[in-house]
């Protein structure tokens, strides 16, 4: 990067954005250290595959609903940091909690605490990022944050592999060690500052009152969210891509290596593609990413060699960089300022529920018709979403 590029980065990425990005990096190191370990550990202590599925389903559903609720609460208070602090704290302490007992109820409680922490912080954190950007710089801000977050997601599994080599099957030790980067993320949160913003105009309500945002949302927001949720209904868990990798290669280490490659490409590409989105328009970059998504799932469908698998994971990283960060920027540009966290929370709650349904649907297709049919179906539906945005969504450079 030349001097002009460096000073441009410093101008866009202020202290708050940098700190939030570092917080996410360490939090993701902690979470992703356990991502490849938890399913194996649960089977070791006697969990059936069904019980593992129920556990993850309950934990993720908790996170899904809580994102909208706590996002709206954050807007009502006109504050972000209390939700960010408590959210990261709960996720950090949940990791070493797993080492304490092997009772199913305790494991359920620990995983639910972790996901509740994610639900607490997500909308408030993204609203805080939005407050520290302009419509012209949001894609870069969210892209930078995602790049740091995803770098942590690459470091975490690599550390897990190292610890499993050094301390085979010593899962309690790994859970305790995962608490260290988690607590570092909590410590960094306390260096953040914010100004209280005007409170939400939606008024208070019950746990599900964040759904009322749909009534006051702009037509552009509604069109965007409809398209994103159709995509989410087929965008199933990455575990299916790892299963396909294991099916093709027969090697767990290659599967984890491919997942690390995906995260590294994602981390490296997120900021440059965010900068490109700020320059040429969010919609153009997003649709390019959506086309890559279809290509990736087609490649996984035809894959019969590690070369195709690793190529698909690399392209998948570019897709994620072209969509995940800038989607949040897109949504916040369309939200009413005092309801930003509610707008994010509404979308992320609905997206999480759709993703859970997508995993169930993909699992059924996989079992009934084979892996290739499931993967081709996802590719086909993503192309339908691509045409939806081309035909029905209109926006300018900052709204798509």
Residue ranges: model-predicted function:
Residues 66-78, 164, 269-282, 366-367:
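Helix-to-loop junctions at the C-terminal end of transmembrane segments
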Residues 82-96, 179, 284-299, 379:
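Structural signature of the two symmetry-related core transmembrane helices
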Residues 172-190, 375-391:
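Symmetry-related core transmembrane helices of the 12-TM Major Facilitator Superfamily/SLC fold
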Residues 181, 189-203, 390-400:
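Helix-loop junctions on the cytosolic side of multi-pass membrane transporters
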